[in-house]
Amino acid sequence: LRHEYDYGKTELGVIPTYKGRVSSTGLSKDGWITGIRHVRTLKNNSAFEIVVGQLSNAQASEAFAIGNEDEYVEVEYSARMGEQHSYELSVEKILQGSFVRGEYRYRLNESDTVFFELVQRTDESAAKVVFGSSGEFAATFSGNSYPIEYFAYYSYINSVFGPRAELIEDFLGTGHGGSLEFSGVASRQHNLEWFVRLDVVDSVSRLLAGVKISFRTRN
């Protein structure tokens, strides 16, 4: 159930996690939260968000039973400062762990953005650090120019960071790691895109390649 207002929105029931790709914290292992989210849009391009629920419990009646092992609580403030700067600050309670998270993005130009994220576990001496860049460039094939998107980052996750690390969308393991991805349009007519991605964490590597199809109608 979702209700949108002029000043924000409220979602109730089984809701998506909405974590951004840049912060690499998409909680796709379980994928959904059973609970409630409220977003309040504030002045000066800022917003306040609160989420309360269960990360993996399929029983809706347990969505507000704070204290269970799969509880999920998040309070976040996000803001944009002009056209170049934006940031997020949040506190989280996930799977018996407490965390403070900060993310900063800087838009270098029309095509490129650099970012930095720090997630500090407050009940343990452990952290997750990410920094990198995303954007778009043009490649020429047979005299034609094709836009290609890229996404690259370095990350470090402490070995005692806890189960929250395993919920990260592209989690391979703790330690030093990095990721490089390229993607582009394969067919505009069929809403088809291609992608190639390489993930490396210490001695573990993973290569992903494929196509994505969108069922959303283009304007």
Question: Could you say what each language-model-derived stretch is?
Answer:
Residues 56-58, 69, 84:
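Alpha-helical scaffold segments
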Residues 24, 60-64, 164, 206-208:
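Outer-membrane beta-barrel and related beta-rich outer-membrane complex signature
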Residues 29-31, 66-70:
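Short, solvent-exposed loop/turn segments at conserved positions within beta-propeller repeat blades
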Residues 78, 84-219:
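Outer-membrane beta-barrel pore domains
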Residues 1-60, 78, 159:
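Outer membrane beta-barrel
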Residues 55, 73, 90-94:
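A conserved mid-domain beta-alpha-beta active-site/ligand-binding segment of alpha/beta enzyme cores
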